[in-house]
Amino acid sequence: MFAKVSSLGLFGLNAFPVDVEIDISRGNPQFEVVGLPDTVVKESRERIRAALRSCSISFPVASVMINLAPADTKKSGSVPDMAIFMAILRGMRMISEELEGCSFIGEISLNGDIRRINGVLPMVMLARELGIKSVFVPADNAKEASVIDGVDIYAVHNAEELIRHFRGEEKLIPCEHYTPPEAAYNETLDFADVRGQQSAKKALEIAAAGGHNALLIGSPGSGKSMLAKRMPSILPPLTFEEALETTKIHSISGLLTPETPIITKRPFRSPHHTISSAGLAGGGSIPHPGEVSLAHNGLLFLDELAEFDRKTLEILRQPLEDRKVTIARASGTITYPCTIMLIGAMNPCPCGYYGHPKRKCICPRNKVAGYLSKISGPLLDRFDLHIEVAPVEFGDLSSKVKEESSADIRKRVMAARAVQEERFKGTGITCNALITPDKLQELCPMDDAAETLMKNVFDRLGLSARAYDRILKVSRTIADIDGSEVIKKQHVAEAAQFRSLDRKYWNE
């Protein structure tokens, strides 16, 4: 008896269709799975035997051959378990209802329970593209799958429910389409908590308004980490398309829960400085997303930047330019997106007090140079804003004046982003930091005074072409905040001052 059931597979972020074909014939009793299955897929044989027993169904005493087509694509994980289970029932004629237009994804346990799997969102998105009408998923994945409209999602708790549904004894009801609630921002982390540091706050407002990378450097206790951790409170909300992109990455990484089936707030990732290269950029035998991809459409904060391994930091150079990470393995090449804001924070030396106005640095000059050399010139060049965070004065700490809240700063950020959205309509660009070189002159016009100042800055500072581009983009953002269509002299002057730290610390 031959039967075929639809399932889906996953390679990186990309889902692909899988046809589970079964042939039950006379011969020596055996149960084989072919079609490039990995070890987990092969182990499904024992899980399915036990699940059938839990449903009081005897496994056929016959030759059972399962083929996972296409046969030239590697199948990994427990995703096709439910489909294999249904194929066996169909092959045994235990169910008569047609399975055309249905797809099954989910792991089956020994007692017949259907267990949660990773990567449901991209697979359901593909099912909709393929015209599949109904997708049966584990109950714990149902909300995540129901984010996608245009396809009926059935939440399955156990194998018995499946059998009763397809025998017509007790029909499952499709899940309601899940509409994610509006993101509620965490007001416990507010810029109003940060005393003083008006210059650093202004710089981070510019970074948020244009999606720019920023490097914070200053002595211990000056508020670098405190400022960076409050950045999400002033970032604009995710669009639905951005939320889907971000959720896909978190879905395949197993970071979603039934309570949070879709990412509605911009990610904030802050890995420890002992992280490996694979942990930061992604990797493994089956390549998984790293921190740069998990921060996609959000913010990656690297605290104690100079404590990271230099080779690990250098891996960031290409992803920051290309906005994607490509990992090559024998089984294929996987690309993960990583459109991120990178915020780095570091001390200027091992003791932390180099350049401090009141405390003496105890580090020898060669130690300071060695510490700073962990941040290479090309990586430093990729930070649009270099922000010096000065020690907080007593007057600021003891002041009774209320600091500006994140909500007020966010209004200006949102206004600047609205200007950019209108400017970039139809271009695929979402913020000033993503302006491509071919569009730079067109989208960042300067008046004569600004152009003269830019030339002087370029010659005097010996800027690279990349640094020039980034100053121009930051100038564009400052002009947007200022409500100016043309970049003026004061906008260039303000942007240029954020490129001074490399001269102060690295090029003395």
Range-by-range predicted roles:
Residues 1-215, 222-225, 263, 328, ...:
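Peripheral, non-AAA+ core regions of ATP-driven protein-machinery
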Residues 18-24, 280, 384-387:
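Short beta-strand elements
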Residues 25, 56-59, 94-97, 129, ...:
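Conserved catalytic network of the ASCE P-loop NTPase/AAA+ motor domain
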Residues 40-45, 60, 67-77, 287, ...:
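Basic, amphipathic alpha-helical bundle interface domains used for macromolecular binding and assembly
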Residues 205, 262, 267, 277-300, ...:
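Conserved alpha-helical scaffold flanking the Walker A/P-loop in AAA+ ATPase domains
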Residues 216-257:
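Walker A/P-loop
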Residues 242-276, 283-284, 390, 430-439, ...:
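Conserved inter-motif catalytic segment of the P-loop NTP-binding fold
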Residues 297, 303-304, 315:
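Walker B catalytic acidic pair
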